[in-house]
């Protein structure tokens, strides 16, 4: 049962790379105290504009695809689940993702491709997420992945029953109302409240935020006074994820461990901490 370990149960997201990395991933998540991990697959490797001629293959992180994630989860059923993914503008993208959903995938994503967020092919994925009642996780990165962040409210309004999870640099940069230079991926310094991300989380019940990766950690630590208030206001909308590229979980070099420490430092109460590390993910992923 999720959360039955001594440490608070956590539901992070991660991606396996090569089979030889399997023991490393298992040990990494165990060192963090993670009880359930959701693996996010890459789409198939193709060379086309939506993958920046192959740059985005493997989620630009040498991640493997649907079959590898499903197989890993099947081999470790007590602690691993899997997502479903595909390059969205391939003719069989919907069919590929739907096949994985029928096999038990619990999320669509991570969608990390060079397409407009409101393009017809993306809207077909939102419709699929709605049909199967699964969330869709989107990597927002200006100039590279999921274009049109300032228009995304239209999709939130058009698909109110879809649980959207925002992730990555542009998503977290926009906690700041003064985030004007979109090319700055990891902005530093004080945050002015009222940024687009802050408003999406406040105004749309179907919008959630994934605290993983360097972008999530940066958002928590660049202005900790703001972060405390941000967490308090959005305590039911934020989810911990690991998304580490290190090999030694739980050490001072481990990004996931730093994120957990920041959450514990800034949450304000054990009840809020548990929401971010466990309860919100359990609800959003229907576990």
Task: Describe every region a protein language model picked out.
Residues 1-37, 235-239, 245-287:
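Mid-to-C-terminal alpha-helical segments outside catalytic/metal-binding sites
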Residues 9-11, 17, 44-61, 173-191, ...:
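Short, flexible/disordered intra-domain loops and linkers
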Residues 10-18, 24-55, 78-85, 105-111:
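Divalent metal-dependent hydrolysis catalytic cores, especially in the metallo-beta-lactamase
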Residues 12-13, 38-41, 83-85, 109, ...:
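Active-site neighborhood of phospho(di)ester-bond hydrolases with catalytic His/Asp-centered motifs
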Residues 22-26, 66-73, 94-98, 122, ...:
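Generic structural signal for well-ordered alpha-helices
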Residues 29, 69, 100, 108, ...:
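Conserved, mostly hydrophobic/aromatic
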Residues 50-145, 213:
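Active-site gating/metal-coordination segments in enzymes
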Residues 106-107, 115, 119-240:
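Catalytic pocket-lining loop regions of alpha/beta-barrel enzymes
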